[in-house]
A protein has these predicted regions:
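N-terminal leader/linker segments that initiate helical-solenoid repeat arrays
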Residues: 26-101
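Short coil/turn linking the two alpha-helices of tandem helical-hairpin repeats
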Residues: 72-76, 110-114, 141-155, 210, ...
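Short solvent-exposed coil/turn linkers within tandem alpha-helical repeat scaffolds
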Residues: 92-99, 128-134, 174-193, 224-230, ...
Length: 283
């Protein structure tokens, strides 16, 4: 399913009829402007695959299994090939100690293909094996509200799932000890990035539910100390603030999201101008 931006309508001189597109920008657009997707490296240590492989080797992992995983791990540029190698590995070695990592990394490959059904299936497979995988929790919880369809009969349940994922991700991060070999600064930076992603996702979940006050609270947390926030976060925050009749703040958010080259540049510019007029009339 290929997603595209829907157009937002603007009232002539009345209240702005701003809307987040019913579907978010296509994944190719999202990844150009988003700080969050895809999964980068396992929270807790770098090169998680190699670390787990070393542990598996100590347990006497079969050489063929090791080679199959290395082929999957080393495939960086071709998502179709990575999917093929990953699925072949899972079919042949379903009980492998490396299975969770394969599922987790298949999430990225399926995201590149905009194959949301298999993104969800791979994420669910990874979380069944490792419920505290922060990377998968944060990524799944972030993706769900971005590809949400208002007419999906399972939409409400999916938003509930996204909320649970992000809340659990933050719970895990709060109790996670700093791993050996990672500096305090590095660990703090990754935790901050994941926490920001979680608040971003929750902001969009609450927006989809039309709970604009809670959405604004989450997205304002995202903006704190953030010099280069995600443009979709800024857009949604602008709509939240508009709905809450905080017009000048809404205009500021729309101005910030009108970054050159952004998929939301034109919409944000138009909305900023319209809301400025509304702010002036409300004084």
């Amino acid at each position: 399913m290929r997603l595209s931006l829907a157009k937002c309508a603007i009232g002539s001189s009345a209240v702005l009829l701003a809307c987040l597109p019913a579907t978010a920008p296509a994944h190719a657009q999202v990844t150009r402007t988003s700080q969050y997707a895809p999964i980068t490296w396992e929270l807790g240590y770098r090169d998680a695959e190699l670390q787990v492989m070393t542990d598996a080797q100590r347990q006497g992992m079969d050489r063929n299994e090791e080679n199959a995983f290395r082929a999957f791990y080393n495939q960086k540029d071709n998502p179709d090939k990575k999917i093929q190698l990953g699925q072949a590995f899972l079919q042949k070695y379903p009980k492998s100690p490396l299975a969770e990592l394969v599922d987790a990394r298949l999430v990225n490959a399926y995201m590149a293909k905009q194959d949301w059904k298999n993104v969800y299936a791979s994420a669910d497979g990874a979380l069944a094996l490792k419920p505290d995988d922060v990377d998968v929790l944060a990524t799944l919880g972030w993706l769900i509200p971005h590809v949400y369809q208002a007419d999906d009969p399972n939409g409400s349940a999916e938003l509930d799932k996204a909320e649970r994922c992000e809340e659990h991700a933050m719970e895990v991060m709060a109790r996670m000890p700093k791993p050996v070999g990672v500096s305090d600064a590095e660990f703090a930076a990754v935790k901050t990035q994941k926490s920001t992603q979680a608040h971003s996702a929750l902001g969009l979940v609450y927006y989809r539910r039309e709970d604009y006050a809670k959405s604004a609270t989450e997205l304002e947390a995202v903006m704190q100390g953030n010099t280069n926030p995600d443009t979709t976060d800024l857009y949604v925050l602008g709509v939240d603030l508009l709905k809450l009749q905080r017009f000048q703040e809404a205009a500021d958010a729309f101005n910030r999201c009108a970054q050159p080259g952004s998929a939301l540049e034109d919409i944000c510019k138009r909305n900023a101008d319209a809301v400025k007029g509304q702010a002036a009339r409300s004084k």
